[in-house]
């Protein structure tokens, strides 16, 4: 993850727990109302049902390994990639919403401006 990048807006998984293992760099996450800072070999636990977001606050690149439990959520990312490829850019919002609903994912795009301003972040390019 590039420096100063918002990895994801606030979102909630209804079926999965998520664990982020920091390989290198620094990552911050908002889990519920708590902001957690993690460095190499640290873990951030994001339980299902708890709104969370993550970003790279530092001046250096960061690498995280995401574990989403139970398995199967990787299909969401495959389908999201296919939607983006079909549209040659950001996917159609209604199709994205349908995809998120199928996977029990509740995204809060309205959180983006606040997260970016509060943590001095920018969005990745699509």
PLM regions: where:
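Ligand-binding loop in jelly-roll beta-barrel domains
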Residues: 28, 48-74
């Amino acid at each position: 993850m590039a420096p100063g990048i918002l990895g994801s807006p606030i979102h909630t998984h209804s079926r999965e727990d998520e664990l982020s293992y920091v390989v290198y760099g620094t990552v911050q996450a908002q889990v519920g109302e708590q902001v957690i800072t993690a460095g190499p070999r640290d873990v951030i636990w994001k339980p299902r049902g708890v709104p969370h977001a993550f970003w790279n606050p530092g001046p250096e690149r960061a690498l995280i390994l995401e574990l989403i439990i139970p398995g199967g959520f990787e299909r969401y990312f495959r389908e999201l990639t296919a939607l983006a490829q079909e549209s040659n850019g950001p996917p159609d919002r209604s199709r994205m919403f349908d995809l998120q609903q199928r996977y029990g994912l509740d995204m809060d795009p309205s959180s983006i401006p606040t997260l970016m301003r509060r943590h001095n972040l920018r969005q990745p390019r699509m």
